[in-house]
């Protein structure tokens, strides 16, 4: 990934907008700050920007971002950062914002778990679904010693499954995507789903059906994982139990559990904001119940919200735009097309070259 400027100086500089969260929504919000001539700081709890795209499935291909017929998750993050870095936003990684307070002058002060304190004129929450942890199968007991070697909850590198017999558990988008995506990588793929039909995208479900008909994937519906058989420091097989109580054994080297994640807003849940379904309620201007505090992306809730990357990018643009009325009260907010703004910037660069 393109090198990121990491803010390491004294936390005394007052900037216009603090963006909490460095996933796609947060990165694009930083770009929008540059486009609107306001300063910003991005605070991300992970070691790198990119959120779930980089942390959980960097090699997963994404198909529903405008302008990208198909793009690996990590490449999308890199492109977003390349678009943003020209404005040199301050970036703080590896720190989690644990609290905020509104000052008498209307500014906001946030504190992190590392003891850092930052002040800004407005705040934007772009923390996705908050902290997340994978859902596990309680019937397997303690398998922590197998996690990351034989048992996985995400595909971070296809090489982990190269030439291996893989059992994939789940029926949503991730399970279907990797049933298709690991063909030609794994030596064998078995998909196990406890329900009678898939819940993932129709196109991918059809591709899985076609792979099953072609004999390149084994599919077990109405079936659950009952147990695993160990061999040395890995696994030898997975025992399956069908709803009719019959059982079967599938030889396996890897168990890929793609049954979702449990999200937790963490400290944000205690900030006194209006919440619904583990998300922060915003108005048409992306403003929360606290004046000067905005939210965008998966963490923001409003009628008709669709939780996809594309919507998060739109939310970010809206939130930054409307934050200007709080950051610069009384000033007339003028819209400038990006093509015009960039043309002026390039002309200025050429004049100073």
Curated annotation (Swiss-Prot):
Signal peptide: none annotated. InterPro entries: FAD/NAD-bd_sf, FAD/NAD-binding_dom, Fd--NADP_Rdtase_type_2, Ferredoxin-NADP_redctase_2. One of its GO terms (molecular function) is ferredoxin-NADP+ reductase activity. Keywords: FAD, Flavoprotein, NADP, Oxidoreductase. Its cofactor is FAD. Coiled coil: none annotated. It catalyses: 2 reduced [2Fe-2S]-[ferredoxin] + NADP(+) + H(+) = 2 oxidized [2Fe-2S]-[ferredoxin] + NADPH. It comes from the Bacteria. Belongs to the ferredoxin--NADP reductase type 2 family. This is Ferredoxin--NADP reductase. It comes from Chlorobium phaeovibrioides (strain DSM 265 / 1930) (Prosthecochloris vibrioformis (strain DSM 265)).
